[in-house]
From Swiss-Prot:
It comes from Thauera butanivorans (strain ATCC 43655 / DSM 2080 / JCM 20651 / CCUG 51053 / NBRC 103042 / IAM 12574 / Bu B1211) (Pseudomonas butanovora). InterPro entries: Cyt_c-like_dom (IPR009056), Cyt_c-like_dom_sf (IPR036909), PQQ_b-propeller_rpt (IPR018391), PQQ_MeOH/EtOH_DH (IPR017512), PQQ_rpt_dom (IPR002372), Quinoprotein_ADH-like_sf (IPR011047). Its cofactor is pyrroloquinoline quinone; Ca(2+); heme c. The active site is at D322. This is 1-butanol dehydrogenase (cytochrome c). Binds 1 PQQ group per subunit. The gene is bdh.
Amino acid sequence: MLTTTFARKREESVPLRKGIQRALLGLSCLVLSTTSFAAGGEWRTHGYDDAGTRYSPLAQITPDNAKELGLVWSYDLESSRGVEATPIVVDGVMYVTAPWSVVHALDVRSGKRLWTYDPEVPREKGKNACCDVVNRGVAVHEGKVFVGSLDGRLVAIDARTGKRVWERNTLIDDDKPYTITGAPRVIKGKVVIGNGGAEFGVRGYITAYDPTAASRPGVVPGPGDPSLPFEDASMEAAAKTWDPAGQVLGSGRRRHGVELDGLYRKAGFCCTSAPATPSPWSHRKRSPAGGDNLYTASIVALRPDTGEYVWHYQQTPADNWDYTSTQDLILADIELGGKPRKVILHAPKNGFFFVIDRTDGKFISAQNFVPVNWATGYDENGRPIENPEGAWPGHLSMRFPAPSARTNWHSMSYSPQTGLAYFPAQNIPLVLQEDKNWSYNQAQPGQAMAGIGWNLGMLVNPRPPASQPFGRLIAWDPVQQKEVWRKEHVSPWNGGTLVTAGNVVFQGTADARLLAFDARDGKELWSAPMGTGVIAAPVTYEVDGKQYVSIAVGWGGVYGNFTRASERRTPGTVYTFALGGKAEMPAFTEYQLNNLVSGVDYNPDDVAEGTGLYVTNCVFCHGVPGVDKGGGIPNLGYSTAETIAHLDQFVFKGPFMPRGMPDFTGKLTPEQVEKIKAFILGTADAVRPKK
């Protein structure tokens, strides 16, 4: 049994076990098997190769001929929510996932459907997904396709027939709001999967399974027994970085999210981009006496056979701002100081680009790639030099970057030819302030999304942000730690990147385009319209001697749920291009443009209380009425008068529950719904242009 957990005396163990283990939940642990190394003509694993570079050796498409790219085929994913999947291409078949963890198998030559598999995720589980009902893809191994379902199952599907071979519930507690949105990885004969849910206060871990029989070799960390000693030294060391006084909050414990995204490369261990979000976000709330709170916001290396801890590097000690480390890790061999070094390249949400020695986890360098104000840099020991003006409690904090900003989950690529990393960067403005009234799972008006289980310990935007949003593509030199070129986009929330040996970088954008750039200087080479905004990354592969580029498109994700940069809202689609492609683009559909809601009576005295209720239950899905435009989910300020007049019919066992809308029966009263209506209508009146 593969277990790396912490167990110690009961009076100390329970909070830490459920806290630090949770830290491993947000763990972006991308684990890749050397046996699944992608042949040049295929895209067999999530990051293309066992180093996660998203660099293809295909070179048929070049800066000179990229303008000749044309559509070859498109495929309708029959979905209306966010599409974050990286397609996998093996033996002439593309496997791609849609929202709600639905798997599609396509003939890569024609784009025709071979089969689909729907794990039939109960739609009430949608409320447990902080950031949309997305899925980032599958793993393919020895005739099976593996997918993690949103409700926490790992499913093995026959790659030829699309029939389920086996499934396993990966959750250690079915009563907790866990989700899986990440792609599984296959490493050394094991299927490995992580999970998410940090905002909801769930405990993180990674599980490994035998792909042939669905047996589970182990859990990291394992559930453990609080009456026993710590199970290894790493958990005992982590326990010392948490304040026991802050570990039990109300009826709950400190929580941390994890999502699988580590890398294995003949080094004997898996490098795990680890624990994402500590919960609550407020460090003072979860650990009043301080402490670094290992292993949150860290890169952790584990033995792939046993899950044994090897080393860690914490990028944001005592994380106060949701600076997850779940972004892509890339393994590279570069020359530093005249010597070859085996390194990890990483650009997480805290706004710094890191170069870490992957053999021992030692810090090499870090440099901010966008403006930051939470820290002025990193010292020689790899600790951030923090800005004391951000100290809590009470301060309004206009943090740069904000929690959704600088980078997010969107994929990075690295070219050994140019020596550059290519990644989307952004600013999504946010103001945070410690919430003095916060208690675990005790939702109060004004606490963002606490009504559906979020535990932030922070007030979100107690006053409007001052900075402006932006989105850009950055080409970064990890040796010199400097930007080489950038491309400004019209909005944040752009897709991940692909780079090829032909010196071409591909990226999709929030304003519904697929772009090609010269990898050397950033010159735009080609553009194709997409049916809606793009958040996923493209892939490339070769069929019958011809290079193709494919991308799965569908607007959504947490930011894309409530706003948009394109007026197109075509259902989720896979688009495939090649030189000389002559197929016609499918017809695009557009958002229906409605006027601000009016003509419904409300009591202006209810607006203030309705504001807090709306923030607590609605804001991160529907946005601010009449201010945000609406994205994957409609903005209620542009609803019809009939909809708002009968809002209770949508809130209580409403018609959109089959699409994932929560049922607020027993959580809101009819009187509270009236006050939410007043806020929607009052805000619409406030922003309506004066005649």
